[in-house]
C-alpha cells in the first residue's frame, strides 16, 4: 500500500502530493493578507415626475463605467479558475436604484443613445485614423456593456449576488441612506433607524443578514458599536487614525483588527496602499498615459452635431466619450494628446505589478513583528474604478491575477474570513474619526451646510414622536411609513457633502428641502387627522425606497 502524508488533518497519497491545489500551497505559505474593499454608493436619485433629470445619470454613468466593468472582471476571474476573495459594500440606495424598473428602463434608453453616438462617431471619423480607432474601442466597449446588461436581465444586484453565493465576494451593507452618524448621535433612535433599516433591506435583497457594515464616510463616534452589535453586525471599517488613536493603543496598528467591548471588530484603513491608488498626484491614476476625465466629446464636438446627445434644454454635458490622455501636468485641456487604450492597459498591468510587489514587501516586513498574520485593508470608493479612473477595472483584474499566479507572500481575503481564522484580537476603544477632510466631521458641518441641521434635528424629534403612535387605519400606517422614508432621505450625507464641494449645490439644497417639506406636511396631516390620500400616493410613488419599512423603528430604544 502506498504511504500517506497527513497534512492539517487531510490525507494525501504520496504519489498525488504534487496535485495539491495551488490554493492550498498558497494558504500554507502566506505570511499575511490583503483585503481591497470597494465601496459602491450613490445617493437615491429617482424622478418619475420628470421625463429627464440630469442627476439620474449619476447612476447611469456608474452602471456603464464602474458596476458592469467590475462585474465583468469578476466573471473573467471566475471563468479562468481564479478563486478570488474580495469584500465590497453595496449601499441600500444603490441597490434600490439598481433594482428599480423605471431606472432600469431609463438606463436602457441611455445606453442606446451612447451606442447610437459611437456608431455615428465611427462614420464621422472614418478618415481620421486614431480617432476612428478610439471610436471603434468605444463601440466594442458598449457592445460588451449591452451584452452583460441583457444577459443579467437588467439585474446587476442579482449578478453580484451570485459571487456572494459562491463565497468569492463578501457583500456588506451601509446605513440606510448613508446618513452621517456622528451628527445624529444625540438621537439614538435616528442612528438605530439608519442601521436597522439597512440590515433589513440587505436581508430582503441578498437572502441573509449582513456580517459587516461600511460606516458612511467611515465616520465613527464612541459607543456606536453597541448599536452595531444589537443589529447582529460583526465588524465595521474605519479610517486608520480611528484605530491608531484607540485606547489602549493597539500594538499592531491598522495591520490587525481591534475588538470593541461589545465584540464587534473594527478594521482600519491602510494609508500606504490607499495612497498608491487614491492619489491623482502620487498615485497610479495620474499617469500621463491614462485617459483624461475632464476632456469629453460633449464639450468638444460641434454643437449641432452633439445636440441630440446632451441635455434636452440644450446645455452641454459629459457623454463619457473621451479621446485624450492626461499627457502631463504642465498644459491645459487644449494641450492633451490622443489617448491609446492599448498602452493604457499595459500601464495598468505595470501598476498592478507594482502594487502587488509593494504589498509583498509590506507583508514581509510586517510579518517579522506581527502575530497573528498582518492584514492590509484597502478601502476605496468603487466609482474610482472606471468612472474617475477609466483603467481602474483593468488594474483590479491584473492585481487579482498577479496575486494569484505570481506571488505566495499574501492571500487575498474577506474581512469576515480573517476574523474566523484569527478570532483573538486586542480589545480597544476606537477613536472618533472619519475618512473625510482632516479626518473628522468638518466636511459635513461647516458654513456651507450648517443650516440643514436644525431642520434635521427638529424632524428627527417629530419622527420619534410619531414612532410611538398606533395608526388608526391603513392610510395613517402608510403616512407614518412615508414620514420615515422622507426623514431618512433628508439625512443622506451626500447632500451636505455636495453643498460643501460647491458642485450641483442647487440640486442638493432642493432635495434636502423637498424631503423636509414632505416630512413636515406628513407630520401635520397625521397630527390633525387630515391625510390627503392622493398627495400621499404621489409622494409614495416618487420616494419609493424601502417598501417594507416600519416606522416603529423610531420608537424608544
Set out the residue ranges of the language-model regions.
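Short, solvent-exposed turn/loop segments enriched in Gly/Ser/Thr/Pro and often Arg
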Residues: 89-94, 175-177, 212-221, 241, ...
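Hydrophobic, small-residue-rich alpha-helical packing segments that form membrane-like cores
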Residues: 226-228
